[in-house]
């Protein structure tokens, strides 16, 4: 599986997340709490509620060990548009990201049949077909692959092209032993990556706050 950051891939896909309203500020670091990112999950693959909840818990645990809190919003693409007030129609921005769970990725330049996902801008995508194939290959549950895959792609959104490492969650390819050692931290960020992720989210929180203050000043 090549989980490499595909910065040039599917730019048009971002158009499906055109901004509809100003983002809700839920990313501040108050009272010593860890910095938070808001992640919308667009479940195009219709993954079951149970598996998705387990996967989100896995991903949140991985990011939590790096010092980042995640607030999830699950968006059902089959539901009718609820308008600008709906969180699923909020801006993507510095601390407001989205993950698409897709049935499959299709033909994407620069990828191969083992590619599980890609990340671009503030949008990450994961193939449930590849998740299920890897789960079957290594004898684990789908959520045990989907959760780390989501965390991996969010890691790319925060770390960029320098994201891959020879160990941990940002490995380009996972092996059977990685899943076997997952309870002992095989899917954690490295210490250096954890510091970089915290610094990047902290920077984004400040950027988000500055943008909102500027917007409020202009609209007075």
Q: Where are the predicted features?
A:
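Hydrophobic alpha-helical segments, chiefly the membrane-spanning helices
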Residues: 26-27, 33, 37, 70-74
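Bacterial N-terminal signal peptides
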Residues: 7-20
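Metzincin-family zinc-dependent endopeptidase catalytic domain
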Residues: 49-157, 163
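Residue-level signature of transmembrane alpha-helix interfaces in integral membrane proteins
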Residues: 18, 83, 168-169
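Metalloprotease/metallohydrolase-associated module, dominated by Zn2+-dependent proteases
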Residues: 24-31, 40-57, 118-140, 144-145, ...
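Short amphipathic alpha-helical "recognition" segments used for binding
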Residues: 7-10, 157, 216
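N-terminal secretory signal peptides that target proteins for export/translocation
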Residues: 1-5
């Amino acid at each position: 599986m090549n989980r490499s950051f595909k910065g040039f891939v599917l730019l048009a896909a971002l158009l499906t997340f055109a901004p509809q309203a100003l983002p809700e500020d839920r990313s501040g670091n108050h009272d010593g709490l860890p910095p938070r990112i808001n992640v919308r999950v667009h479940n195009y693959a219709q993954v079951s509620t149970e598996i998705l909840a387990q996967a989100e818990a896995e991903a949140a645990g991985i990011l939590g060990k790096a010092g980042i809190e995640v607030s999830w919003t699950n968006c059902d693409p089959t539901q009718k548009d609820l308008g600008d007030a709906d969180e699923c129609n909020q801006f993507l921005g510095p601390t407001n990201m989205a993950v698409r769970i897709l049935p499959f990725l299709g033909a994407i330049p620069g990828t191969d049949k083992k590619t599980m996902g890609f990340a671009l801008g503030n949008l990450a995508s994961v193939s449930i077909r590849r998740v299920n194939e890897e789960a079957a290959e290594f004898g684990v549950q789908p959520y045990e692959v989907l959760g780390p895959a989501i965390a991996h792609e969010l890691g790319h959104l925060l770390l960029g092209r320098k994201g891959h490492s020879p160990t941990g969650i940002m490995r380009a390819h996972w092996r059977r032993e990685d899943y076997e050692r997952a309870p002992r931290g095989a899917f954690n960020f490295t210490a250096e990556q954890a510091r970089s992720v915290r610094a990047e989210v902290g920077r984004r929180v400040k950027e988000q706050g500055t943008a909102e203050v500027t917007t409020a000043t202009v609209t007075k």
